[in-house]
């Protein structure tokens, strides 16, 4: 019967499993934010304000992440710029 199992349609994931996956992503995101310094949201807003002087972007177009290693901290800044026409 193995060959017939191959042709059976794959069932869509249940809404419970989709909700569980989404919740795990949210929890992981919140845990990563817990270890960030207090000044990071203010810094992100100030960077957005400076970029807006030159380019029209939204708040969601700038992501800032602080990674800490043993002896070094890395501030990663990702800015999605609009396409030039």
From Swiss-Prot:
UniProt xrefs under InterPro entries: MinE, MinE_sf
Domain of life: Bacteria
Gene Ontology terms: biological process: cell division; regulation of division septum assembly
Keywords: Cell cycle, Cell division
One Pfam family, short name: MinE
Family: Belongs to the MinE family.
HAMAP family reported in the protein's UniProt record: MinE (MF_00262)
Cited function: Prevents the cell division inhibition by proteins MinC and MinD at internal division sites while permitting inhibition at polar sites. This ensures cell division at the proper site by restricting the formation of a division septum at the midpoint of the long axis of the cell.
Protein name, as recorded: Cell division topological specificity factor
Organism the protein comes from: Marinomonas sp. (strain MWYL1)
Encoding gene per record: minE
């Amino acid at each position: 019967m193995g060959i017939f199992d191959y042709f059976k349609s794959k069932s869509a994931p249940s809404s419970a499993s989709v909700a569980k996956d989404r919740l795990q992503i949210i929890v992981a995101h919140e845990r990563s934010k817990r270890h960030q310094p207090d000044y990071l949201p203010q810094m992100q807003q100030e960077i957005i304000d400076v970029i807006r002087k030159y380019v029209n972007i939204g708040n969601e177009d700038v992501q800032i992440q602080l990674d800490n290693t043993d002896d070094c901290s890395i501030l990663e800044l990702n800015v999605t710029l609009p396409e030039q026409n």
